[in-house]
Curated annotation (Swiss-Prot):
It is found in: Cytoplasm. Belongs to the gamma-glutamyl phosphate reductase family. This is Gamma-glutamyl phosphate reductase. Pathway: Amino-acid biosynthesis; L-proline biosynthesis; L-glutamate 5-semialdehyde from L-glutamate: step 2/2. Its EC number is 1.2.1.41. GO terms for molecular function: glutamate-5-semialdehyde dehydrogenase activity; NADP binding. It catalyses: L-glutamate 5-semialdehyde + phosphate + NADP(+) = L-glutamyl 5-phosphate + NADPH + H(+). One of its GO terms (cellular component) is cytoplasm. Catalyzes the NADPH-dependent reduction of L-glutamate 5-phosphate into L-glutamate 5-semialdehyde and phosphate. The product spontaneously undergoes cyclization to form 1-pyrroline-5-carboxylate. GO terms for biological process: L-proline biosynthetic process. Transmembrane segments: none annotated. Keywords: Amino-acid biosynthesis, Cytoplasm, NADP, Oxidoreductase, Proline biosynthesis.
Length: 428
């Protein structure tokens, strides 16, 4: 492992003297190599999916594992977008001159060697490499075994592209397989002095393991127990449109909505129509009603008053803290905005929270009082994504408050240093 770390550290030094044009050219070459190997990538992904289903892997993990022509095109597009973005390295964040003539500049520099530990998400392989390379970092990619078939051609294409562009091939590496299960992960987490930062991407168990076991700095990407509050002043059609997008478009995403909070004044019309909309995905989910509802007493009564009971269940105490990542949703009727805010404060994972309202004062209050990385008024939580935010890609969505918060693009992979120029000044 130490030899791997040494090669990565040497790669950082080589990247430091690469021009922005050279790095951008390498990204475009990798894009072209991925495009050339797209059939191999999709065949390999099909092997991963077959193995995952045979092993009984949880549905959300299978969904995150899947690649398609459309997703591959998104990956290629993100490489193009990143290659066109301004290089953050060397940017002067601030600069000033002291009374004694010292010129001080605070400039942006790479973190150094970063490790990304992630589960069954082959797209992370490409995104993490691209963001790290563009921002002058070397990256150690520790992927979950569920995506091993998919990652092989992805990594092969990355290396082919870098070689063709005369790039820094050693800037991306994978850890060697150790005899002890998760031994490589434990080694990475203890690699103080070798690894500058670790980014975990995955479920609660993975993130907890990394955070609790790390001796190196961790930039945490948190789970998403995201809420949608439908205010009494909401345009119901807008609320329904957002609910459908935020829950059904990609339930396995961390930015999908997991809890519906509905003002009592609009609960009946909203919930009845949500029930109808969610039922349209029955063919996909192969369950009655399409989506399972876990309800407080009031919403249970409303959702069952027209006879539907097979997919409506009573909520338990732990319901409100569940990240389903599936065609399931928690529902609660609230008397006012205050109770919605209290519920969110108790159960939010500080990822993405949404209010649908036509009342500007309530919208402003929601913006101010909700403690989350992304707070939305009249828009879907599904926008919490580096690509959607115009970053090209993301290393993850940070729910912590130090260093970075929200979707993390190029700048989240940088830190700063001070450059001081003088003419012989000494401190009096």
């Amino acid at each position: 492992m130490v030899e791997v770390y040494a090669r990565l550290r040497a790669a950082v030094a080589r990247l430091a003297v690469c021009s922005a044009a050279e790095k951008d050219g390498a990204l475009r070459a990798v894009r072209d190599a991925l495009h050339a190997q797209r059939e191999d990538i999709l065949r390999a992904n099909a092997q991963d999916l077959a193995r995952a289903r045979e092993a009984g892997l949880a549905a959300p993990l299978v969904a995150r594992l899947a690649l398609s022509e459309h997703l591959l095109e998104d990956m290629l597009r993100s490489l193009t977008v990143l290659s066109l973005q301004r290089d953050p390295i060397g940017e002067i964040i601030e600069g000033y001159t002291l009374a004694n003539g010292l010129e001080i500049r605070k400039v942006r520099v790479p973190l150094g060697v970063v490790a990304v530990i992630y589960e069954s998400r082959p797209n992370v392989t490409v995104d993490a490499f691209a963001l790290a390379y563009k921002s002058g970092n070397a990256v150690l990619l520790r992927a979950g075994s569920a995506a091993s078939y998919s990652n092989a051609p992805l990594l092969r294409a990355i290396h082919v592209g870098l070689k063709k562009a005369h790039g820094v091939v050693d800037a991306v590496a994978v850890p060697p397989v150790l005899e002890e299960k998760y031994g490589d992960v434990d080694h990475i987490l203890r690699a103080r002095g070798f690894i500058d930062a670790v980014f975990p991407r995955g479920g609660a168990a993975l993130i907890r393991r990394v955070v609790e076991g790390a001796h190196v700095p961790v930039i945490e990407t948190g789970c998403g127990v995201c809420h949608l509050y439908v205010d009494e002043s909401a345009n119901i059609d807008v609320a329904l449109q957002i609910a459908e997008n935020a829950k059904l478009q990609k339930p396995a995403a961390c930015n999908s909505v997991e809890t519906l909070l509905v003002h009592r004044a609009v609960a009946r019309p909203f919930l009845h129509r949500v029930q109808e909309i969610f039922a349209t995905c029955e063919e996909t989910t192969r369950k009655p009603g399409g989506v399972d509802f876990f309800c407080d007493a009031e919403s249970f009564s409303l959702l069952t008053e027209r006879g539907a009971r097979k997919n409506v269940f009573h909520a338990q105490a732990e319901t409100w803290d569940r990240e389903y990542l599936d065609y399931q949703v928690s529902v609660r009727v609230v008397p006012n905005l205050e109770e919605a805010l209290r519920h969110i404060a108790r159960h939010s994972t500080k990822h993405s929270e949404v209010i649908v309202t036509r009342d500007r004062a309530r919208a402003r209050r929601f913006h101010q009082e909700v403690d989350a990385a992304c707070v939305y008024v009249n828009a879907s939580s599904r926008f919490t994504d580096g690509g959607q935010f115009g970053m090209g890609a993301e290393i993850g969505v940070s729910t912590q408050k130090l260093h970075a918060r929200g979707p993390m693009g190029l700048c989240a992979l940088t830190t700063s240093k001070y450059l001081i120029d003088g003419e012989g000044q000494v401190r009096p």
